[in-house]
Amino acid sequence: MGKKLLIVANHFATIYKFRKELVSKLVEEGYDVIISLPFSPDIEKIKDLGVRVIDTKVDRKSLNPIKDLKLLNDYKNLIKEEKPDLVLAYTIKCNIYGGMACRLYGVPFMANVTGLGSAYYRGGMLKNIVSSLYKIGLKNAKGVFFENIANARVLIDDKTINDDQAIVLKGAGVNLQQFEYCEMPSDKVVKFLFIGRIMAEKGVNEL
């Protein structure tokens, strides 16, 4: 059996819809992949990729510190039991508490920042709390992946991470076998369709 990789995430879609190809490649390369996330009716789709899935409750929107402490404890127990060679985390709470748990046990850790969240853009006390937690969770990260340079610069300028920790990716990628390439239409007028939330942090101001 190859090296054990633990992936922690907060939702089925985070892994299956956006990271399915990565997971399949890791399994193909011989990694023993374990995925920790909240169970959903579609969880068998992830298991079919050849990985083991562990049900871990993650309340994405809760501000209850008791729930967050429970999540930290769940990650500590999971890492202690599974003894992974590397932990890869996605999304804010998983990055923070997964990183903290890895620090306690000296397990190599990498984080993927899929977005900074509204707290960073709104500022105030909540932003300061999230920033402080991120500094603790990401302190020993071997690498922190970003999908755009703007998010990376925010955490670097806030001294949440060091320059050498930041790794900017060219997007999450598109499976061209599932979504085939099409030629541009011959129309001279180019029309854009924006599908997303009407929020500044989602790029509305750049349209």
Regions inferred by a protein language model and the residue ranges of each:
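N-terminal strand-loop element at the rim of the active site
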Residues: 8-66, 166-168
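Short hydrophobic "strand-cap" motifs at the C-terminus of beta-strands
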Residues: 8, 147, 192-196
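Short His-centered aromatic/hydrophobic patch
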Residues: 89-95, 113
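An amphipathic, basic-hydrophobic alpha-helix
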Residues: 58-86, 96, 100, 104, ...
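Active-site proximal beta-strand in glycosyltransferases
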Residues: 4-6, 102-119, 134, 145, ...
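Nucleotide-sugar donor phosphate/pyrophosphate-binding loop at the beta->alpha transition
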Residues: 16-18, 66-73, 108-110, 118-140
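A conserved mid-protein helix/loop that constitutes part of the nucleotide-sugar donor-binding site
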Residues: 16-21, 190, 194-207
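Donor nucleotide-sugar binding/catalytic pocket of nucleotide-sugar-dependent glycosyltransferases
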Residues: 54, 135-181, 191
